[in-house]
């Protein structure tokens, strides 16, 4: 068991990956937490991707304004978030037994990105 960490308020982001039958490993990111289904603001890439491509995916989001420090809030560390997106893409691309990864929410703060909950579903080809 790992000790819980105190985290500052930030922006909740979803980072996920799946094995699509047509495209293979895919990674996605978007506004997370309870807002994922409400706003449907996600960006997808075929995995694996590097941090620069992950950052481009993040910058496509309508929610980028929240991550950049909307209404006086501190901007999120988008580079740290891009590292998380790239890592999830690598995980799905490298492990065929993984059919789905859902990291939601990832809390993006000015000091980094912290996964608060995650689910890995096995079921692909081993």
Label the predicted regions:
Residues 1-126:
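ATP-dependent carboxylate/acyl-activation modules
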